[in-house]
């Protein structure tokens, strides 16, 4: 499988780039975290599997989602919201892995937000579908 970061030029040794007020492209920043994040993702999804949520209008979202941390983002007929309880398991969302926290706080610091402390993480899984 091709490396998406290489295709997009995100792994290249180039300086960070401000792309809009308050938004910075941190090329290659996450690469040192990949192995730890993927391992931790397996632990998170074992407790809170990916699912296709429903919009308030009844459409099933194409992206599969899960959450970790103190709250999780939800979408269903009742609307969009954050909740501390996973509606599919009836339990709290899994704790946010330390490597997720390190990635988020490091990226925020490099982007100019040194005081950022992550408390929730929405994880999206996009899958390729052939048109038609």
Please identify what each model-predicted range represents.
Residues 1-132:
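Non-heme Fe(II) oxygenase metal-center motifs and adjacent flexible, charged/small-residue loops
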């Amino acid at each position: 499988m091709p490396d998406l970061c290489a295709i997009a030029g995100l792994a290249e040794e180039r300086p960070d780039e401000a792309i809009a007020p308050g938004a910075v492209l941190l090329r290659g920043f996450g690469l040192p975290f990949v192995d730890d994040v993927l391992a931790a993702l397996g632990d998170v999804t074992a407790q809170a599997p990916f699912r296709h949520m429903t919009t308030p209008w009844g459409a099933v979202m194409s992206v599969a989602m899960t959450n970790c941390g103190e709250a999780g983002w939800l979408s269903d007929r009742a609307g969009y919201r954050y909740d501390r309880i996973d509606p599919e398991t009836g339990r709290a969302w899994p704790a946010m892995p330390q490597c997720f926290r390190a990635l988020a706080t490091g990226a925020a610091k490099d982007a100019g937000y040194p005081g950022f402390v992550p408390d929730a993480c929405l994880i999206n899984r996009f899958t390729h579908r052939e048109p038609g």
